[in-house]
Amino acid sequence: MKYLAVVIATLLMTHSHAEDKSKWTGKNKPLANATYLVYSGEPGDRGPPTTTDRKLAIAIRGQAAKEIFDSIGPDAKEVSCSLEDGERMRSKGEVWCSYMPSDGYMCFLGFNLRTGKPHSGGTC
């Protein structure tokens, strides 16, 4: 669980590692454009959480997703989730992000809440 807290705190402060024209303050930014789900099963086959299987999926959009996307490059080659021209995908470990001209930036991450280990937070 300690690992989970460290990873979430790091993601909330991703702006500290991004090149930003504004002065870095070391303060967390609000994460207003994010959603989460506690579930059981796998990202592509989710069900209600159980006493033995509880996972957390987090989806982040907007500027925070762009900062994460920019931090985990380069683009994945020959990987696509849609037929949209201009789609870009990036991933590191269990964190993956996409950019679609029609929808902007979106990043996914997740954790197994029973073990604290990273887990994919989304699927195509």
Where are these regions (language model features)?
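Positively charged n-region of N-terminal signal peptides that target proteins for export
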Residues: 1-5
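Short, exposed beta-strand-loop hairpins at the edges of beta-sheets
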Residues: 98-124
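Mature extracytoplasmic domains of secretory-pathway proteins
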Residues: 30-93
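Hydrophobic h-region of N-terminal signal peptides that target proteins for export
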Residues: 9-17
